[in-house]
From Swiss-Prot:
Gene Ontology cellular-component terms listed: ribonucleoprotein complex; ribosome
Annotated NCBIfam families: L9
GO MF entries: rRNA binding; structural constituent of ribosome
High-level lineage: Bacteria, Bacillati, Bacillota, Bacilli, Bacillales
Keyword RNA-binding assigned: yes
Protein name: Large ribosomal subunit protein bL9
Length: 149
């Protein structure tokens, strides 16, 4: 019997797959547990519609990420911090501070985990910070740290 998997089933199939399984297994386990539905024309067309919708959403997310990249690369985030001799900071600038400043000054919400700051910023001046907006889109954000008066 052909079934469409609604959830991942270890050793049998992944969500969205159409596979042939034993009739008893399909009726008594997969369909009863809500793990699969029978692969009839109605369910197959519903699956096709769902796959098309997911593709559209993926394309839309990619476009939004590209637009956000252009916006971020045009901006400079201004932060102030106390510093000592030679422009070294007391403490450091973290990705959370950068994300908060973006939200506050420019109303752009970026998750702090997407800001790929290898080491916290510990010196005054300009720093280019990579921001991973999408698996295929990475922006570079300029961060300017000035001395606090």
């Amino acid at each position: 019997m052909k079934v469409i998997f609604l959830k991942d089933v270890k050793g049998k199939g992944k969500k969205g797959e159409v596979k042939n399984v034993a009739d008893g297994y399909a009726h008594n386990f997969l369909i009863k547990q809500g793990l699969a539905v029978e692969a009839n024309p109605t369910n197959l067309s519903a699956l096709e519609g769902q796959k098309n919708k997911e593709k559209k959403n993926a394309v839309q997310e990619l476009e939004q990420a590209k637009q956000l990249k252009e916006t971020l690369e045009a901006l400079t985030v201004e932060l102030t911090a106390k510093s000592g001799e030679g422009g070294r900071l007391f403490g450091s600038i973290t990705s959370k501070q950068i994300a908060d400043k973006l939200q506050k000054d420019h109303q752009i919400k970026v998750d702090k985990r997407k800001i790929e700051l290898n080491d916290a910023i510990r010196a005054l001046g300009y720093t280019n910070v990579p921001v991973k907006l999408h698996p295929e889109v990475q922006a570079t954000l300029k961060v300017h740290v000035t001395e606090q008066a």
